[in-house]
């Protein structure tokens, strides 16, 4: 396992939250990524906004520097309006009396107006000021009138002036409009950013403030802490990124995805490398925990030791011939290659992979390193082929960095060869020239074909690997071997697909050639 140096980093980024881009302060530590809401950035106010606590502008939907500018969804449509201009099918009109404070005014912000095809809406109530103390106003209230002045058809500026001239005592007619609340409510990292999948029993985090699922650690800040252990950091995976500014962080249980946007390509690359580095630095800890968990139940011949585990992307075929990359967790043990759709924290989960392939019947057939990494527009991929009873199963995987590609290439090649040395031999029954025989391939001794004679076996043929001149199969049930002997080509009916034994044969040969130093 390589030694990784953990990175620390901090700065402003944008987070996709409730289909809106909001600015957050990101802080990366060795074990977690903390996101803190930037209140001023989430709902920016124009510079001249201090008339009785009201913004003096067009509602803030497209202010310079706003995260929503040109990026978020369009302004919400106006609620259905009746003949009098009021929203239909909504709660009754309420009359609220508010006494302004000497400093701070009403203490509300408004959005909407006739030019925006919206009623005048209360979009923010400042804590501790007059509106908040009245306990009678709420976000999403439409202001219908101020001291008798009708605001149903008022522009935003007209509403601002009416509230400004209202005097110390203000009588408001308001009506709550539920449909617009999601558009004006400030997104909350604590309540609106779902994130689960941390280890349910993780010794390494048991005494850390970053343990478990993300949480609200400071009552005065909108903050969430994302444990990085077994997360998947990716680029250009689940969301198009034409500007190369996005970073995806997938939870260990694959249920949630966090999308971050940086100011430019270079910043995004820097953040991605730092996050990815810290995730990879936690892998030795994960391997130790997994092997400790599995060691309690593994048998002497179980070979359950996990050699490597990490997230990558697998190419999946969709309807219509389309293809899509999707996250997949790959684990390599002493004998098997395992694929999961989420992190198996428990023994039961570990015992139920989506796919399991014997390494001795698997080989790496492609490992391509493009001139650039996925974060810069080119894919780094490798492919595996496994001989199974159904034929050849092929998987194409994508990694995020050149180092990942190198690691997986080495792990798979060395893992297949080590599995060959560990397993030593494979034996199966078949039919040769009309008689039932047993065909055995031994890593050291080569090929043996025996026949059972009433409890005792007799050797029909025995050849070392170097005598093999040709091997072939029909992909259905027959295996053809030619050792250059007087018997000529041997045709063995395996009664099932010959691909598993063919792949085992090739793995044995590759491992022996590598051991002899003839193949690096």
From Swiss-Prot:
Protein name, as recorded: Beta-2-syntrophin
Positions of the SU domain: 464-520
Main location as per UniProt: membrane
Membrane topology label: Peripheral membrane protein
Lineage of producing organism: Eukaryota, Metazoa, Chordata, Craniata, Vertebrata
Domain description: The PH 1 domain mediates the oligomerization in a calcium dependent manner.
Composition skew (Pro residues), residue ranges: 73-82
Homology family: Belongs to the syntrophin family.
SMART domains, A to Z: PDZ, PH
Region entry Disordered, spans: 45-95, 195-220
Origin species: Mus musculus (Mouse)
Molecular function terms, GO-annotated: actin binding; calmodulin binding; structural molecule activity
PTM entry text: Phosphorylated. Partially dephosphorylated upon insulin stimulation.
Record-annotated PDZ domain positions: 95-178
PANTHER family: BETA-2-SYNTROPHIN, SYNTROPHIN
Pfam families: PDZ, PH, PH_17, Syntrophin_4th
Modified residues (Phosphoserine): 75, 90, 109, 191, 202, 213, 373, 375
Annotated gene: Sntb2
Tissue and organ expression note: Ubiquitous. Expressed at high levels in the testis.
GO cellular component, one term: protein-containing complex
Complex and partners: Monomer and homodimer. Interacts with the dystrophin protein DMD and related protein DTNA; and with the other members of the syntrophin family: SNTA1 and SNTB1. Interacts with the neuroregulin receptor ERBB4. Interacts with PTPRN when phosphorylated, protecting PTPRN from protein cleavage by CAPN1. Dephosphorylation upon insulin stimulation disrupts the interaction with PTPRN and results in the cleavage of PTPRN. Interacts with the sodium channel proteins SCN4A and SCN5A. Interacts with SAST, MAST205, microtubules and microtubule-associated proteins.
Cellular localisation: Membrane; Cytoplasmic vesicle, Secretory vesicle membrane; Cell junction; Cytoplasm, Cytoskeleton
């Amino acid at each position: 396992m390589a030694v990784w140096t953990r990175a620390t980093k901090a700065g402003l980024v944008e987070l996709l939250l409730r289909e809106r881009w909001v600015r957050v302060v990101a802080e990366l530590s060795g074990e977690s990524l903390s996101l803190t809401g930037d209140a001023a950035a989430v709902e920016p106010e124009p510079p001249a906004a201090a008339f009785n606590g009201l913004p003096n502008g067009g509602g803030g939907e497209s202010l310079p520097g706003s995260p929503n500018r040109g990026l978020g969804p369009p302004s919400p449509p106006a609620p259905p309006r009746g003949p009098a201009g009021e929203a239909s099918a909504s709660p009754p009109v309420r009359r609220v009396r508010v006494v302004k404070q000497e400093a701070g005014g009403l203490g509300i912000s408004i959005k909407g107006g006739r030019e925006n095809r919206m009623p005048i809406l209360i979009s923010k109530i400042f804590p501790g000021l007059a509106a908040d103390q009245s306990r009678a106003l709420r976000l999403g209230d439409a202001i219908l009138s101020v001291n008798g002045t009708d605001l149903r058809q008022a522009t935003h500026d007209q509403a601002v002036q009416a509230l400004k001239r209202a005097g110390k005592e203000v009588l408001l007619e308001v009506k709550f409009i539920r449909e617009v609340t999601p558009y004006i409510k400030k997104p909350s990292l604590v309540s609106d950013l779902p994130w689960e999948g941390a280890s349910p029993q993780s010794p390494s985090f048991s005494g850390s403030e970053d343990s478990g699922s993300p949480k609200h650690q400071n009552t005065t800040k909108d903050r969430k802490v994302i444990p990085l252990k077994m997360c998947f950091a990716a680029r250009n995976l689940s969301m198009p990124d034409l500007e190369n500014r996005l970073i995806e962080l997938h939870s260990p249980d694959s249920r949630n995805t966090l999308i971050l946007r940086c100011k430019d390509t270079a910043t995004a690359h820097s953040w991605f490398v730092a996050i990815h580095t810290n995730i990879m630095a936690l892998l030795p800890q994960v391997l130790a925990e997994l092997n400790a968990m599995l060691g309690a139940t593994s048998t002497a011949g179980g070979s359950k030791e996990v050699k490597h585990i990490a997230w990558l992307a697998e190419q999946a075929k969709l309807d219509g011939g389309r293809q899509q990359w999707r996250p997949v967790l790959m684990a390599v043990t002493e004998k098997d290659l395992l694929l999961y759709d989420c992190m198996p924290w428990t023994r039961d989960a570990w015992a139920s992979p989506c796919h399991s392939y014997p390494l001795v019947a698997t080989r790496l057939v492609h490992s391509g390193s493009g001139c650039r990494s996925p974060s810069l527009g080119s894919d780094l991929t490798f492919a595996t082929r496994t001989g199974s009873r159904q034929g050849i199963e092929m998987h194409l995987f994508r990694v995020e960095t050149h180092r990942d590609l190198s690691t997986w290439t080495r792990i798979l090649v060395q893992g297949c060869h080590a599995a060959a040395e560990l397993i030593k031999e494979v034996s199966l029954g078949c039919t040769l020239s009309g008689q039932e025989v047993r065909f055995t391939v031994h890593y050291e001794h080569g090929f043996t074909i025996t026949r059972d004679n009433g409890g005792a076996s007799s050797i029909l043929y025995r050849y070392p690997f170097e005598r093999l001149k040709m091997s072939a199969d029909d992909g259905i049930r027959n295996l053809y071997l030619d050792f250059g002997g007087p018997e000529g080509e041997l045709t063995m009916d395996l009664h099932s697909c010959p691909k598993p034994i063919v792949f085992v044969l090739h793995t044995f040969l590759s491992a022996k050639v590598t051991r002899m130093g003839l193949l690096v």
